[in-house]
Protein backbone atom coordinates (compact mmCIF):
# COMPACT_ATOMS: atom_id res chain seq x y z
CA UNK A 1 0.00 0.00 0.00
CA UNK A 2 1.39 3.40 -0.89
CA UNK A 3 1.72 5.66 2.09
CA UNK A 4 -0.56 8.71 1.87
CA UNK A 5 2.25 11.02 2.92
CA UNK A 6 6.03 10.97 2.69
CA UNK A 7 7.36 12.99 5.59
CA UNK A 8 10.75 13.36 7.15
CA UNK A 9 11.20 15.74 10.06
CA UNK A 10 14.95 16.05 9.38
CA UNK A 11 14.31 17.62 6.02
CA UNK A 12 11.40 19.62 7.34
CA UNK A 13 11.96 23.00 8.95
CA UNK A 14 13.91 23.34 12.19
CA UNK A 15 10.86 25.13 13.58
CA UNK A 16 8.81 21.95 13.27
CA UNK A 17 11.48 19.85 14.99
CA UNK A 18 11.74 22.39 17.81
CA UNK A 19 7.98 22.64 18.29
CA UNK A 20 7.71 18.86 18.54
CA UNK A 21 10.15 18.88 21.46
CA UNK A 22 8.42 21.85 23.07
CA UNK A 23 10.81 24.67 22.16
CA UNK A 24 10.93 27.74 19.97
CA UNK A 25 14.66 28.57 19.99
CA UNK A 26 17.97 26.74 19.59
CA UNK A 27 19.66 26.07 22.94
CA UNK A 28 23.20 27.25 22.25
CA UNK A 29 22.57 30.31 20.06
CA UNK A 30 24.03 32.81 22.54
CA UNK A 31 27.15 30.72 23.25
CA UNK A 32 27.82 30.09 19.54
CA UNK A 33 27.26 33.78 18.73
CA UNK A 34 29.56 34.93 21.52
CA UNK A 35 32.39 32.66 20.31
CA UNK A 36 31.71 32.63 16.55
CA UNK A 37 34.83 34.61 15.54
CA UNK A 38 37.11 32.50 17.71
CA UNK A 39 35.53 29.29 16.37
CA UNK A 40 35.94 30.45 12.77
CA UNK A 41 39.60 31.44 13.29
CA UNK A 42 40.60 28.19 15.02
CA UNK A 43 38.77 25.91 12.58
CA UNK A 44 40.06 27.65 9.45
CA UNK A 45 43.63 27.07 10.61
CA UNK A 46 43.19 23.47 11.80
CA UNK A 47 42.93 19.89 10.56
CA UNK A 48 40.19 17.53 11.78
CA UNK A 49 39.53 13.81 11.79
CA UNK A 50 35.91 12.84 12.55
CA UNK A 51 35.37 9.18 13.45
CA UNK A 52 31.84 7.83 13.21
CA UNK A 53 31.17 10.91 11.11
CA UNK A 54 28.22 9.53 9.14
CA UNK A 55 25.93 8.83 12.09
CA UNK A 56 23.41 11.47 13.11
CA UNK A 57 25.68 13.27 15.60
CA UNK A 58 28.76 12.66 13.44
CA UNK A 59 27.07 14.27 10.43
CA UNK A 60 25.98 17.22 12.57
CA UNK A 61 29.54 17.76 13.87
CA UNK A 62 31.05 17.34 10.41
CA UNK A 63 28.72 20.01 9.03
CA UNK A 64 29.54 22.42 11.88
CA UNK A 65 33.26 22.03 11.05
CA UNK A 66 32.82 22.09 7.27
CA UNK A 67 30.83 25.33 7.20
CA UNK A 68 33.70 27.10 9.00
CA UNK A 69 36.19 26.24 6.22
CA UNK A 70 38.75 23.91 7.88
CA UNK A 71 42.24 23.42 6.46
CA UNK A 72 41.67 19.63 6.41
CA UNK A 73 38.61 17.53 7.25
CA UNK A 74 38.72 13.75 6.90
CA UNK A 75 35.70 11.68 7.90
CA UNK A 76 35.67 7.95 8.72
CA UNK A 77 32.58 5.79 9.15
CA UNK A 78 31.74 2.11 8.74
CA UNK A 79 28.48 2.93 6.91
CA UNK A 80 29.13 3.43 3.22
CA UNK A 81 25.51 4.47 2.55
CA UNK A 82 25.38 7.08 5.32
CA UNK A 83 28.70 8.49 4.11
CA UNK A 84 27.29 8.96 0.60
CA UNK A 85 24.33 10.85 2.09
CA UNK A 86 26.67 13.01 4.21
CA UNK A 87 28.59 14.11 1.11
CA UNK A 88 25.39 14.75 -0.86
CA UNK A 89 24.02 16.77 2.08
CA UNK A 90 27.19 18.85 2.44
CA UNK A 91 27.51 19.52 -1.30
CA UNK A 92 23.84 20.49 -1.50
CA UNK A 93 23.89 22.74 1.59
CA UNK A 94 27.38 24.26 1.77
CA UNK A 95 29.11 23.41 -1.51
CA UNK A 96 32.89 23.24 -1.27
CA UNK A 97 35.81 24.40 0.87
CA UNK A 98 39.34 25.48 -0.01
CA UNK A 99 40.73 22.79 2.29
CA UNK A 100 41.14 19.03 1.94
CA UNK A 101 37.79 17.24 2.47
CA UNK A 102 37.72 13.44 2.13
CA UNK A 103 35.61 10.55 3.41
CA UNK A 104 36.64 6.95 4.11
CA UNK A 105 34.31 3.96 4.63
CA UNK A 106 36.42 2.15 7.22
CA UNK A 107 35.91 0.15 10.42
CA UNK A 108 37.87 1.92 13.16
CA UNK A 109 38.76 -1.46 14.69
CA UNK A 110 40.31 -2.76 11.46
CA UNK A 111 43.81 -3.18 10.08
CA UNK A 112 42.83 -1.00 7.10
CA UNK A 113 42.01 1.85 9.47
CA UNK A 114 45.38 1.47 11.21
CA UNK A 115 47.09 1.65 7.80
CA UNK A 116 45.09 4.79 6.97
CA UNK A 117 46.22 6.42 10.24
CA UNK A 118 49.83 5.42 9.59
CA UNK A 119 49.67 7.11 6.17
CA UNK A 120 47.41 10.05 7.05
CA UNK A 121 47.51 10.47 10.82
CA UNK A 122 48.40 14.15 11.16
CA UNK A 123 45.42 16.00 12.62
CA UNK A 124 45.08 18.81 15.16
CA UNK A 125 41.71 17.61 16.45
CA UNK A 126 40.31 14.08 16.53
CA UNK A 127 36.59 13.72 17.25
CA UNK A 128 35.17 10.25 17.91
CA UNK A 129 31.39 9.98 17.50
CA UNK A 130 31.31 6.22 16.88
CA UNK A 131 29.29 4.17 19.37
CA UNK A 132 26.89 1.34 19.88
CA UNK A 133 24.20 3.43 21.52
CA UNK A 134 21.13 1.22 21.83
CA UNK A 135 20.06 -0.22 25.16
CA UNK A 136 18.73 -3.22 23.20
CA UNK A 137 22.30 -4.08 22.10
CA UNK A 138 22.89 -5.70 25.49
CA UNK A 139 20.32 -8.42 24.80
CA UNK A 140 22.90 -10.99 23.63
CA UNK A 141 26.54 -11.57 24.68
CA UNK A 142 27.99 -11.12 21.17
CA UNK A 143 26.55 -7.70 20.35
CA UNK A 144 27.42 -6.74 23.93
CA UNK A 145 31.07 -7.66 23.31
CA UNK A 146 31.07 -5.56 20.15
CA UNK A 147 29.65 -2.69 22.21
CA UNK A 148 32.64 -2.99 24.55
CA UNK A 149 35.03 -3.01 21.58
CA UNK A 150 33.46 0.04 19.93
CA UNK A 151 32.70 2.11 23.03
CA UNK A 152 35.78 1.30 25.11
CA UNK A 153 38.69 -0.31 23.25
CA UNK A 154 38.37 1.51 19.90
CA UNK A 155 38.27 4.78 21.84
CA UNK A 156 41.38 3.83 23.81
CA UNK A 157 43.19 2.77 20.62
CA UNK A 158 42.34 5.92 18.67
CA UNK A 159 43.45 8.12 21.57
CA UNK A 160 46.82 6.34 21.62
CA UNK A 161 47.13 6.85 17.86
CA UNK A 162 46.33 10.54 18.37
CA UNK A 163 49.02 10.78 21.07
CA UNK A 164 51.56 9.05 18.81
CA UNK A 165 50.76 11.41 15.91
CA UNK A 166 50.97 14.55 18.06
CA UNK A 167 47.33 15.68 17.91
CA UNK A 168 46.39 18.72 20.02
CA UNK A 169 43.07 17.43 21.29
CA UNK A 170 40.81 14.36 21.37
CA UNK A 171 37.06 14.59 21.79
CA UNK A 172 34.58 11.78 22.24
CA UNK A 173 30.93 11.45 23.18
CA UNK A 174 29.82 10.05 26.48
CA UNK A 175 26.12 9.86 27.39
CA UNK A 176 23.74 11.07 30.07
CA UNK A 177 23.34 7.33 30.76
CA UNK A 178 26.94 7.25 32.09
CA UNK A 179 25.81 9.25 35.14
CA UNK A 180 24.60 6.56 37.56
CA UNK A 181 24.22 3.97 34.75
CA UNK A 182 21.40 1.41 34.84
CA UNK A 183 22.13 -0.29 31.50
CA UNK A 184 25.16 -1.87 29.88
CA UNK A 185 25.39 0.83 27.20
CA UNK A 186 25.61 3.60 29.81
CA UNK A 187 28.01 1.50 31.88
CA UNK A 188 30.26 0.90 28.86
CA UNK A 189 30.50 4.68 28.42
CA UNK A 190 31.23 5.09 32.14
CA UNK A 191 34.06 2.56 31.79
CA UNK A 192 35.21 4.44 28.68
CA UNK A 193 35.41 7.59 30.83
CA UNK A 194 37.72 5.69 33.22
CA UNK A 195 40.03 4.78 30.32
CA UNK A 196 39.94 8.43 29.19
CA UNK A 197 41.20 9.53 32.60
CA UNK A 198 44.28 7.33 32.18
CA UNK A 199 45.02 8.64 28.69
CA UNK A 200 44.35 12.26 29.77
CA UNK A 201 47.74 12.25 31.48
CA UNK A 202 49.28 12.12 27.99
CA UNK A 203 47.01 14.42 25.95
CA UNK A 204 44.09 16.82 26.32
CA UNK A 205 40.72 15.04 26.10
CA UNK A 206 37.23 16.47 26.47
CA UNK A 207 33.82 14.87 26.14
CA UNK A 208 30.10 15.66 26.17
CA UNK A 209 27.09 14.10 27.83
CA UNK A 210 23.81 15.01 26.28
CA UNK A 211 20.19 14.20 25.86
CA UNK A 212 18.38 12.26 23.17
CA UNK A 213 19.02 13.69 19.72
CA UNK A 214 15.58 14.18 18.21
CA UNK A 215 15.03 12.08 15.08
CA UNK A 216 18.58 10.67 15.08
CA UNK A 217 19.04 7.43 13.13
CA UNK A 218 17.62 4.44 14.95
CA UNK A 219 15.90 6.55 17.61
CA UNK A 220 12.25 6.09 18.47
CA UNK A 221 11.40 9.48 16.93
CA UNK A 222 13.23 8.52 13.73
CA UNK A 223 11.08 5.39 13.86
CA UNK A 224 7.96 7.59 13.75
CA UNK A 225 9.03 8.75 10.27
CA UNK A 226 9.54 5.14 9.20
CA UNK A 227 6.19 3.99 10.59
CA UNK A 228 4.32 6.73 8.73
CA UNK A 229 6.11 5.97 5.46
CA UNK A 230 5.38 2.24 5.88
CA UNK A 231 1.83 2.87 7.09
CA UNK A 232 2.36 1.18 10.45
CA UNK A 233 1.21 2.02 13.99
CA UNK A 234 3.02 4.59 16.14
CA UNK A 235 4.26 2.94 19.34
CA UNK A 236 5.81 4.69 22.34
CA UNK A 237 6.24 4.33 26.12
CA UNK A 238 3.91 6.63 28.09
CA UNK A 239 5.93 6.58 31.32
CA UNK A 240 9.39 7.66 30.14
CA UNK A 241 10.38 11.31 29.79
CA UNK A 242 13.54 12.52 28.11
CA UNK A 243 15.45 15.71 27.33
CA UNK A 244 15.82 16.30 23.60
CA UNK A 245 18.27 18.31 21.52
CA UNK A 246 18.14 18.79 17.75
CA UNK A 247 20.83 17.25 15.51
CA UNK A 248 22.37 20.71 14.94
CA UNK A 249 22.50 21.33 18.70
CA UNK A 250 24.28 18.01 19.19
CA UNK A 251 26.89 19.10 16.65
CA UNK A 252 27.33 22.49 18.32
CA UNK A 253 27.73 20.92 21.77
CA UNK A 254 30.41 18.53 20.51
CA UNK A 255 32.25 21.30 18.66
CA UNK A 256 32.24 23.63 21.68
CA UNK A 257 33.63 20.88 23.91
CA UNK A 258 36.26 19.92 21.33
CA UNK A 259 37.52 23.47 20.73
CA UNK A 260 37.02 25.09 24.14
CA UNK A 261 36.99 22.18 26.59
CA UNK A 262 39.95 21.90 28.93
CA UNK A 263 41.54 18.54 29.67
CA UNK A 264 39.01 16.09 31.21
CA UNK A 265 36.08 18.51 30.83
CA UNK A 266 32.66 16.97 30.21
CA UNK A 267 30.24 19.44 28.57
CA UNK A 268 26.47 19.07 28.98
CA UNK A 269 23.38 21.17 28.19
CA UNK A 270 22.21 23.22 31.17
CA UNK A 271 18.67 22.56 32.24
CA UNK A 272 16.52 25.64 31.76
CA UNK A 273 13.02 26.72 30.87
CA UNK A 274 13.92 25.87 27.27
CA UNK A 275 15.22 22.37 27.97
CA UNK A 276 12.65 20.29 29.78
CA UNK A 277 11.49 16.70 30.04
CA UNK A 278 8.95 15.52 27.51
CA UNK A 279 7.46 12.06 27.04
CA UNK A 280 7.71 10.05 23.84
CA UNK A 281 3.92 9.65 23.80
CA UNK A 282 3.46 13.45 23.94
CA UNK A 283 5.84 13.90 21.00
CA UNK A 284 4.01 11.18 19.07
CA UNK A 285 0.71 13.02 19.49
CA UNK A 286 2.22 16.37 18.38
CA UNK A 287 3.95 14.65 15.47
CA UNK A 288 0.72 13.12 14.17
CA UNK A 289 -1.15 16.40 14.63
CA UNK A 290 1.50 18.20 12.55
CA UNK A 291 0.78 15.68 9.80
CA UNK A 292 -2.96 16.27 10.11
CA UNK A 293 -3.82 12.99 11.83
CA UNK A 294 -5.78 12.41 15.01
CA UNK A 295 -4.13 9.80 17.29
CA UNK A 296 -6.31 6.73 17.89
CA UNK A 297 -5.32 4.87 21.06
CA UNK A 298 -5.23 1.07 20.77
CA UNK A 299 -5.17 -1.58 23.50
CA UNK A 300 -2.98 -4.24 21.82
CA UNK A 301 -0.30 -4.61 19.15
CA UNK A 302 -2.64 -6.71 17.00
CA UNK A 303 -5.42 -4.11 17.11
CA UNK A 304 -2.94 -1.39 16.13
CA UNK A 305 -1.56 -3.44 13.24
CA UNK A 306 -5.04 -4.18 11.87
CA UNK A 307 -6.29 -0.59 12.15
CA UNK A 308 -3.25 0.70 10.24
CA UNK A 309 -4.97 -0.61 7.08
CA UNK A 310 -8.12 1.47 7.49
CA UNK A 311 -7.76 4.41 9.91
CA UNK A 312 -5.48 6.72 7.86
CA UNK A 313 -8.25 7.30 5.28
CA UNK A 314 -10.41 8.60 8.14
CA UNK A 315 -7.73 11.08 9.21
CA UNK A 316 -6.71 8.97 12.22
CA UNK A 317 -3.57 7.00 13.04
CA UNK A 318 -3.36 3.94 15.34
CA UNK A 319 -1.15 4.45 18.41
CA UNK A 320 -0.08 2.08 21.16
CA UNK A 321 1.21 3.86 24.27
CA UNK A 322 2.28 1.47 27.04
CA UNK A 323 4.37 1.38 30.20
CA UNK A 324 8.01 0.38 29.75
CA UNK A 325 9.10 -2.96 31.21
CA UNK A 326 12.30 -3.74 29.31
CA UNK A 327 15.83 -4.12 30.71
CA UNK A 328 17.98 -1.01 31.02
CA UNK A 329 15.38 1.74 30.71
CA UNK A 330 16.15 4.70 32.94
CA UNK A 331 12.99 6.45 34.11
CA UNK A 332 14.74 9.81 34.49
CA UNK A 333 17.79 11.51 33.01
CA UNK A 334 20.74 13.20 34.63
CA UNK A 335 23.89 14.74 33.18
CA UNK A 336 25.95 14.72 36.36
CA UNK A 337 25.98 13.21 39.84
CA UNK A 338 26.21 14.96 43.21
CA UNK A 339 29.84 13.80 43.48
CA UNK A 340 31.00 15.75 40.41
CA UNK A 341 32.48 19.26 40.42
CA UNK A 342 30.69 21.70 38.11
CA UNK A 343 31.54 24.93 36.29
CA UNK A 344 28.19 26.58 35.51
CA UNK A 345 29.49 30.09 34.83
CA UNK A 346 31.78 29.82 31.78
CA UNK A 347 28.97 29.48 29.22
CA UNK A 348 25.33 30.57 29.13
CA UNK A 349 23.69 27.25 28.26
CA UNK A 350 26.57 24.80 28.59
CA UNK A 351 27.56 23.30 31.91
CA UNK A 352 30.95 21.67 32.48
CA UNK A 353 31.94 18.80 34.75
CA UNK A 354 35.54 19.26 35.95
CA UNK A 355 37.57 16.11 36.59
CA UNK A 356 40.85 15.15 38.21
CA UNK A 357 42.69 12.23 36.55
CA UNK A 358 41.23 9.67 38.91
CA UNK A 359 41.38 6.03 37.85
CA UNK A 360 42.48 2.69 39.25
CA UNK A 361 45.16 1.12 37.07
CA UNK A 362 44.50 -2.32 38.58
CA UNK A 363 40.81 -2.12 37.62
CA UNK A 364 41.57 -1.06 34.05
CA UNK A 365 44.10 -3.89 33.69
CA UNK A 366 41.59 -6.35 35.14
CA UNK A 367 39.01 -5.22 32.59
CA UNK A 368 41.42 -5.50 29.65
CA UNK A 369 42.70 -8.92 30.73
CA UNK A 370 39.25 -10.34 31.51
CA UNK A 371 37.82 -9.30 28.14
CA UNK A 372 40.94 -10.59 26.37
CA UNK A 373 40.57 -13.99 28.06
CA UNK A 374 36.90 -14.22 27.05
CA UNK A 375 37.83 -13.45 23.43
CA UNK A 376 40.67 -16.01 23.45
CA UNK A 377 38.18 -18.66 24.58
CA UNK A 378 35.76 -17.63 21.79
CA UNK A 379 33.06 -18.18 24.41
CA UNK A 380 31.50 -15.92 27.02
CA UNK A 381 28.14 -15.22 28.62
CA UNK A 382 26.26 -12.03 29.30
CA UNK A 383 26.41 -12.90 33.01
CA UNK A 384 30.23 -12.90 32.92
CA UNK A 385 30.29 -9.45 31.36
CA UNK A 386 27.64 -8.05 33.74
CA UNK A 387 29.66 -9.36 36.70
CA UNK A 388 32.79 -7.66 35.34
CA UNK A 389 30.85 -4.40 34.91
CA UNK A 390 29.73 -4.58 38.56
CA UNK A 391 33.40 -4.99 39.55
CA UNK A 392 34.25 -1.85 37.56
CA UNK A 393 31.21 0.12 38.80
CA UNK A 394 30.17 -1.14 42.27
CA UNK A 395 27.02 1.03 42.37
CA UNK A 396 25.95 -0.02 38.86
CA UNK A 397 22.13 -0.02 38.91
CA UNK A 398 21.58 -2.77 36.32
CA UNK A 399 18.40 -4.82 36.72
CA UNK A 400 17.77 -7.74 34.38
CA UNK A 401 14.06 -8.06 33.54
CA UNK A 402 14.51 -10.65 30.80
CA UNK A 403 12.58 -8.37 28.42
CA UNK A 404 14.14 -6.41 25.57
CA UNK A 405 12.86 -3.94 23.00
CA UNK A 406 13.41 -6.44 20.18
CA UNK A 407 10.54 -8.50 21.56
CA UNK A 408 8.13 -5.55 21.29
CA UNK A 409 6.62 -3.62 18.39
Give the location of each predicted region.
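Flexible, Lys/Arg-rich cytosolic regulatory linkers and terminal tails that connect or flank
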Residues: 1-45
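Hydrophobic/small residue at the entry helix of a nucleotide-binding pocket
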Residues: 57
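NAD(P)H-binding glycine-rich loop region in Rossmannoid oxidoreductase-like domains
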Residues: 60, 64-75, 91, 99, ...
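Strand-loop microenvironment adjacent to phosphate/nucleotide-handling motifs in alpha/beta enzyme folds
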Residues: 38, 196-409
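Helix N-cap at the beta1-alpha1 junction of Rossmann-like dinucleotide-binding domains, i.e.
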Residues: 77-82
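Conserved glycine-rich cofactor-binding loop
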Residues: 54
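Hydrophobic/aromatic anchor residues within beta-strands of the central parallel beta-sheet
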Residues: 103, 147, 205-208
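Conserved Rossmann-fold NAD(P)-dependent oxidoreductase catalytic core, especially the SDR/UDP-sugar
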Residues: 1, 128, 132-193, 198
